[in-house]
Amino acid sequence: MNIIQQLEKEQFDKLSATKTIPEFGPGDTVIVNVKVVEGERTRVQAYEGVCIGRSGGGLNESFTVRKISYGEGVERVFPVMSPMIDSIKVVRRGKVRRAKLYYLRKLRGKSARIVEKKTDRAAATN
């Protein structure tokens, strides 16, 4: 293990102790609360959309969230360990068979919907 990997691992461990990141993947609908700086004030802005992919690993990991705003598709890439991310919440799990959902960029309307993943009721009650 070289020095850079060792430093990244130390930073990742330090940030992981303070931040709780839920398990989510492509197809999941997430709400990302982002800290926005406006002049001297900072506020938290919620960004809700479908996670269309995750890339990287460790300290350099990021994920892309896509939403439709006023009929226009908007994508935003968030670093997982960014200090600008206040929290991440998973709203619903999606049933997909791909790691990258870039094909959603071409789809409109009902065809762009993702089926919700069914959870096993027996496992949920125990």
From Swiss-Prot:
Keywords: Ribonucleoprotein, Ribosomal protein
GO biological process, one term: translation
Family statement drawn from the similarity comment of this UniProt entry: Belongs to the bacterial ribosomal protein bL19 family.
Encoding gene (name): rplS
Secretion signal span: none
Designated name of the protein: Large ribosomal subunit protein bL19
Molecular function GO terms recorded: structural constituent of ribosome
Described purpose of this protein according to its UniProt entry: This protein is located at the 30S-50S ribosomal subunit interface and may play a role in the structure and function of the aminoacyl-tRNA binding site.
GO cellular component annotations of the record: cytosolic large ribosomal subunit
Domain of life: Bacteria
Pfam families: Ribosomal_L19
Organism the protein comes from: Nitrobacter winogradskyi (strain ATCC 25391 / DSM 10237 / CIP 104748 / NCIMB 11846 / Nb-255)
Annotated Gene3D superfamilies: 2.30.30.790
Parts of the chain that traverse the membrane: none
InterPro entries listed in its UniProt record: Ribosomal_bL19, Ribosomal_bL19_CS, Ribosomal_bL19_sf, Translation_prot_SH3-like_sf
